């Protein structure tokens, strides 16, 4: 299996401090969440997508929420700020988890967000289950989709809810692409969109809503590329 650090997006966890410095922040300064949110959302549409999750699965004050593959914990902080839920930001990469914890302290949200540096496949929550679980562009990194989907189901309360944004195979996928996807995207459990839904349903999830975001994300990426090229 390839190392996740081979994926360029994850090569430098501390780069976010350079972005914040460019906004005028010094190393010792407290941070405004809205400024941090410009850089700490490692998924399409930033906090708009996180707000959609809050509304879609009705995240409320005092809910116990787990974010799987939290990166810097951007969505976790936004959820905590907007709802006053208690959020566990679970992240495999130690450097991202440590930087995320520092950002949480600097935004004054440490009472609501707990950063956990652990592999999701090894993670256990013995005392309580979660009311809500969320994840953005992270699950496809984890091997053995059936195993971790079952784990997601078992970590939720009986009336708990799950919100996922993730990658699936596109219509142009060929088996020869697999090695490239593993190396460039650390893709360890990609499957077709329909199979993804089946995997969730087969472990016990009731699928209330789903949407193929391929065309939307393609448009988003093209527009972002144009901005970077200007």
Describe the role of every protein-language-model region.
Residues 1-22:
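N-terminal auxiliary segments of SAM/dcSAM-dependent transferases
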Residues 43-61:
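Conserved alpha-helix/loop element of class I SAM-dependent methyltransferases that forms part
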Residues 66-68, 72-122:
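Class I SAM-dependent methyltransferase SAM/SAH-binding core
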Residues 123-133:
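A short acidic, Gly/Pro-enriched loop at the edge of an enzyme's catalytic core
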Residues 146-161:
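A short glycine-rich, Lys/Arg-flanked "PGG" loop and its adjoining helix->strand segment in the class I
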Residues 167-187:
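Short, glycine-/aromatic-enriched active-site segment of Class I SAM-dependent methyltransferases
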Residues 189-204:
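Short alpha-helix
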Residues 211-230:
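C-terminal helical/coil "lid" or tail adjacent to the Rossmann-like core of SAM-dependent
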């Amino acid at each position: 299996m390839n190392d996740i650090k081979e994926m360029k997006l994850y090569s430098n966890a501390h780069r976010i401090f350079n972005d914040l410095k460019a906004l005028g922040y010094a190393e010792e300064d407290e941070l405004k969440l809205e400024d941090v949110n410009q850089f700490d959302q490692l998924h399409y549409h930033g906090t708009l997508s996180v707000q959609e999750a809050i509304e879609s699965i009705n995240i409320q004050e005092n809910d116990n929420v787990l974010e799987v593959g939290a990166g810097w914990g951007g969505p976790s902080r936004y959820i905590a700020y907007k709802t006053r839920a208690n959020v566990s930001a679970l992240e495999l990469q130690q450097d991202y988890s440590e930087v995320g914890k520092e950002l949480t302290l600097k935004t004054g949200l440490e009472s609501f967000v707990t950063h956990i540096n652990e592999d999701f496949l090894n993670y256990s929550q013995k005392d309580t289950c979660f009311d809500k679980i969320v994840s953005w562009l992270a699950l496809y990194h984890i091997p053995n989709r059936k195993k971790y989907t079952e784990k997601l189901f078992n970590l939720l309360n009986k009336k708990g809810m799950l919100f996922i944004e993730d990658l699936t195979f596109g219509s142009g996928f060929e088996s020869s692409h697999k090695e490239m996807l593993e190396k460039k995207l650390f893709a360890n459990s990609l499957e077709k969109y329909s199979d993804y839904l089946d995997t969730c349903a087969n472990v016990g999830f009731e699928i209330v809503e789903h949407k193929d975001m391929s065309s939307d994300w393609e448009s988003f990426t093209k527009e972002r590329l144009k901005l970077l090229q200007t």
